[in-house]
From Swiss-Prot:
Family indicated by similarity: Belongs to the RecX family.
Function text: Modulates RecA activity.
Name under which the protein is recorded: Regulatory protein RecX
Gene3D superfamilies tied to this protein: Winged helix-like DNA-binding domain superfamily/Winged helix DNA-binding domain
Tagged with keyword Metal-binding: no
GO biological process: regulation of DNA repair
Protein source organism: Bacillus cereus (strain AH187)
Gene Ontology CC annotations of this record: cytoplasm
Length: 270
């Protein structure tokens, strides 16, 4: 049995208190607690506490400490239930305490996976223009349940997906000016897949791109690559030269007809 002999406010934190006790051998430092725990257990000078009571006090102090750590972590941005659990595990908090903290956070509505999923979907679609497949995968990795994700993705209709994909295409295609139209389409297709768009949405967007095909830019790309390969393979003669040129330009996405026109032009120049 111990008796509380003194309670003093810590110098560095006005919300924490040092508790001094006497176990029959004079006053000594016992432990420190948060103000919440001080009030919860009615700690005051003269109070007698046994080992069981002390164990409860210290356990609740650990819960309160972990709770405040979680609140601080949440102050930067919203988090999912799993993210909070992982954060506390990294802080080497025990599972029993983690469960209590998460339960309290859920009760106090500091964490709500449904609200998180909806806001995350809106942000990733409107700001980062990610497709639904990537958004779903990221939410799953954050521990959000599949049913909640399905509900949140209703915030991202197909029309909006197409709009975002077309914006991404418009931005990215400028970097493919020296590619054949076919190769540009393939690269844009790969980009949209990485961004998380469905095959259906990609097909619709690339069909629109087909209508914008620029013959002049296609010729410029053909001449750019054709002249590069011409310098590379001009040391070869006849069939070998033409075969290497055709293979190289075909791999770049140019049609046989386009390649023949280019080679004919080179013959006439020669």
């Amino acid at each position: 049995m111990a008796v509380i002999t003194k309670i003093e406010v810590q110098k560095r934190s006005k919300e924490r208190f040092n508790i001094y006790i006497d176990k029959g051998q004079g006053e000594e430092y016992g432990f420190s607690v948060n103000e919440v725990i001080l009030i919860k257990h009615g700690l005051q000078k003269g109070l007698e506490i046994d080992e069981i009571a002390l164990g409860n006090i210290l356990y609740n102090e650990e819960v309160q400490k972990a709770y405040l750590q979680a609140i601080s972590y949440l102050s930067y941005q919203m988090r999912t239930k799993l993210e909070i659990e992982d954060f506390l595990r990294k802080k080497e908090v025990g599972q029993a305490i983690i469960s209590e903290v998460v339960s309290k956070l859920l009760h106090d509505r500091y964490i709500n996976d449904k609200e998180y999923a909806i806001l995350y979907t809106r942000t990733q679609s409107n700001v980062n223009r990610k497709g639904p497949t990537v958004i779903k995968r990221e939410l799953l990795n954050k521990g959000v349940q599949d049913l909640i994700i399905t509900h949140s993705l209703q915030e991202y209709p197909k029309e909006k997906q197409i709009e975002n994909a077309l914006i991404l295409i418009e931005k990215k295609k400028k970097s493919y000016q020296k590619h054949s139209f076919l190769q540009m389409k393939l690269k844009l297709d790969e980009m949209l897949v990485r961004k998380g768009y469905s095959r259906d949405v990609i097909q619709i967007c690339l069909e629109e791109l087909k209508d914008e095909k620029d013959d002049e830019k296609q010729r410029e790309a053909l001449h750019y690559h054709g002249n590069k390969y011409y310098e590379k393979y001009k040391k070869y003669d006849g069939w070998t030269f033409e075969n290497k040129m055709k293979q190289a330009l075909y791999r770049k996405g140019f049609s046989i007809d386009e390649i023949e026109i280019f080679l004919q032009m080179k013959r006439e120049e020669g």
